[in-house]
Amino acid sequence: TDDKNIFTQLLSGLSCLLIDGYDRAILIDCRTYPARGVSEPEKDKVLRGSRDGFVETLIFNTALIRRRIRDVNFTVEIMQTGESSHTDIAICYMKRRVDENLLKKIKDRIENLHVDALTMNQESLAECIFPHKWFNPFPKFRFSERPDTAAASILEGNIVILVDNSPACMILPSSVFDIIEEADDYYFPPVTGTYLRLSRMTVSFLTLFLTPVWLLFMQNQNWIPGWLEFVKLADDMYVPLIFQLLILEFAI
């Protein structure tokens, strides 16, 4: 009986059956979805594990996750946003494991969105529900194009958001340590996966702190300990500090 809902479903591809003398419309879902084949993501390949990835069709993406989680507690809630686009959004989570406060916060933010369309799919949604702040440059979520990564995150109690027309998902909450993880870590033995994560973490910290420490030592050379004397220039020659920093960045 809701004309707006009927028009929205018709524009989404459903068939509408009207019967003379009956004051309701019957919506029939007999549509097919134009979609590309399921293949491994180009930017998220693994040495071991499955070779499938998300596509641009929301119903296929939820099926790829459901294939891995056959549990009654696995929940998929469909929402819509966008005055013109009416973009479908799927919120996937596990009951009894998810943070209920975070889930309610995300659903409230999506329901209160007032946008014309999500032109850039999940990127537009991310900017709307989690706007960037200058004093917090770290991301609050991470993206993945792999259904096995999404399924593993859901089983850990995280929330996965799928947006129609997007071949990626948003996983939240997220921390700095989640960003340095890769899908291969789940397929290797625990010792190997832990070693790989620690290696990436060490390189990340060195990249972040080595340059300012170098600058501090070059401006205060009397602070350099004896076992680091080799970093000093052996000959009395002038090398601009900017070139030293550039060489250090290339070395890292």
What is the meaning of each model-derived region?
Residues 1-244:
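Cytosolic regulatory modules rich in charged/polar residues
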Residues 248-252:
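Hydrophobic, membrane-inserted alpha-helices
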